[in-house]
Amino acid sequence: MSSVTMRDMLKAGVHFGHQTRYWNPKMNTYIFGARNKIHIINLEQTLPLFNDAMAFLNKLAASNNKILFVGTKRAAQKAVSEEAQRCGMPYVDHRWLGGMLTNWKTIRQSIKRYRELEAQFQDGTFDKLTKKEALMRKREMDKLERSIGGIKDMGGLPDALFVIDVDHEDIALQEARKLGIPVVAVVDTNSNPDGVDYVIPGNDDAIRAIQLYVKAAADVILEGKQYAQNQTGGESEFVEVADEAAGEKAEG
C-alpha cells in the first residue's frame, strides 16, 4: 500500500491551506491552526484519510475497475496525465466537458470520431486530401485529443473519480454524484467536502503536493492490478489477497 509518510507530506507542503479569509467552515475539523493568515491543515488527520483513500483505489484496481483521474488546473495537468497513463487509467487534464459522465452516449460518439481521424492520420488518408481539408481534419483531431484523448480507452463509465481540487472540478463532482459514482478527492481549506466519499484534506495548489497524491494513487493502482493478474479465483478472492498484503505491509 501507500508508503507516503507525514515527513513526505510536510516536504511537499500538503499542510499549507488557503488564506484564512477564504476558508470553508466545513473544513474546520481538518484545520490545525493558522500561521501568517494561512490555514495549516492537520496532517495527523490527513495521513490516515489519505491511506483510506489509497486503500479504496487499490481495492478497485484489484477488482479490475476503472478510476478516472481528473485535474484540469494548470498545476495538476502534467502530473495527472503522466501518472494516469503510467497506471493505465483514463484521465481528464484539460477542460471538463459538461456531460462527460451524464451524457456518455454523446461523448462515445466523439470518441468514435476521434478514433476515425486518428486512423486516417496514421494510414496516410490525410495526405490524399487537399491542404485545406487535411488542415481542418488535423485541427478537429487535435481539439478532440485535448478534450477526450485521455478517456478514449475508458470504454464506459468509470467506477470512481480521483479528483484534484473539488472547486475547480465542481461539474465533474455533480455528475459523479448524480450517477452514484464514488469520489476520492483532495479538498483544500477553501472547499466544501460534502459529496466527496474519500476526503483527502490537503493543499491542492502546490505542484509538489499534487505530484505526491497522484504518484501514490498510481502506485497503489498498479499494485492492485498486479494482485488481479496474480489471482486465479473470483473477484472476492483477490480483493481479500489485496487486503492481506496491505495489512502485512502496514505491519512490516
Curated annotation (Swiss-Prot):
Pfam families: Ribosomal_S2 (PF00318). Disulfide bonds: none annotated. One of its GO terms (cellular component) is cytosolic small ribosomal subunit. GO terms for molecular function: structural constituent of ribosome. One of its GO terms (biological process) is translation. Signal peptide: none annotated. Keywords: Ribonucleoprotein, Ribosomal protein. InterPro entries: Ribosomal_uS2, Ribosomal_uS2_bac/mit/plastid, Ribosomal_uS2_CS, Ribosomal_uS2_flav_dom_sf. Belongs to the universal ribosomal protein uS2 family. NCBIfam families: rpsB_bact (TIGR01011). This is Small ribosomal subunit protein uS2. The gene is rpsB.
